[in-house]
Amino acid sequence: MAIHLYKTSTPSTRNRAVDSQVKSNPRNRLIYGLHCCSKGRNARGIITAGHRGGGHKRLYRKIDFRRNEKNIYGKIVTIEYDPNRNAYICLIHYGDGEKRYILHPRGAIIGDTIVSGTEVPIKMGNALPLTDMPLGTAIHNIEITFGKGGKLARAAGAVAKLIAKEGKSATLKLPSGEVRLISKNCSATVGQVGNVGVNQKSLGRAGSKCWLGKRPVVRGVVMNPVDHPHGGGEGRAPIGRKKPVTPWGYPALGRRSRKRKKYSDNLILRRRTK
């Protein structure tokens, strides 16, 4: 994709970059209204996820994570921007007349053909079961439960690796560094999700961040004691604790938040590293 760099005429345009070729032109049958009213609050109106609120209105695009159009070739017609995710999406026209959106694989261009099913070619954008893939294949949009659609490695630039197959299970290395077992009957898409450098793109100004629904981040040390354990004091005061904590008093620099005795504990061979 072509990246347009702004000429530095104001402080807000310094280092600002946008994608000049990716537009949003959704199809009416593949979108519906998305009413997001929580803004980081729970049913009682209490903030449970900070720094969320505002943002531009959005229409949700129906993404085909299941890839259940078996053995029917499809053609990439457009590559579009999706306001609901960092990755781009592709509009696919299948041979039977079906039209669907899928995640844009890295390197795919308009006019490429894709297919899903068993014993299909190991080609970027094709979807097939893990049992039919060779070891070392880079994959994304991976199912956890057979037939439920892809759940893992769906963010921009995400990619997992098939490292082993034994018995009824396949061993995958996920983008987080976690190594876990998944049924070989589950399907995945070959390749890496596109828009790899999205985290390195500079928005240029605070207003662009607000359009995405992300509000300013405030340090706890400048808050009042009622709002944060670090708050209070006269002037610039230290936090008054041995270690920093979250607004709810939990250790801020590392605390295990995973539920104990979760059903998938036996499937995880190595913990994630990030």
Swiss-Prot record:
GO molecular function (one): rRNA binding
Subcellular location: Plastid, Chloroplast
Coiled coil: none
GO BP: mitochondrial translation
GO (cellular component) term, any one: mitochondrial large ribosomal subunit
Alphabetical keyword list: Chloroplast, Plastid, Ribonucleoprotein, Ribosomal protein
Highest taxon in the source lineage: Eukaryota
Protein name: Large ribosomal subunit protein uL2cz/uL2cy
Organism: Lotus japonicus
Gene name as annotated: rpl2-A
